[in-house]
Amino acid sequence: LENPLFGTVLDVWMSLRGDAIAPPWRVEDLLRYPVIVIPFISVVDVTPNGGFRYRFWGTGHVDVKGYDYTGHSPLDHEPPEYGRMINDEYQAVADAARPMAFVHDIRPGLTEISKYQETLRLPLANDGRTVSGVISFA
């Protein structure tokens, strides 16, 4: 990954997790990340049916992609194959219970030019043992 802030984000996540498999989601912990990355953070919760729902969608994502997905599923992204890819990334992180990085093109709209994006996805575990969400920086 080329973005030097990925190392900083990973360091903060590791300091928050302690001895657990992953840190819990706490709004106040978001402020431990560098101010410059917060607009480019998103957080999904694992839903009771095993899917994912965005709890937090940073304003930087709105600026770049043109949408606010707060309250939506990753499967709501367009085009549908992009939504499935994002959902599969969240599932991979939840299944592995470890940080993972992804590199892909994004298409903010169906007619717009694709943009290169690196994403770091890190699990969250409210009980310290079971993945309950994923925090991402892109």
Residue ranges and their predicted role:
Residues 1-77, 84-138:
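Intrinsically disordered, low-complexity terminal regulatory regions
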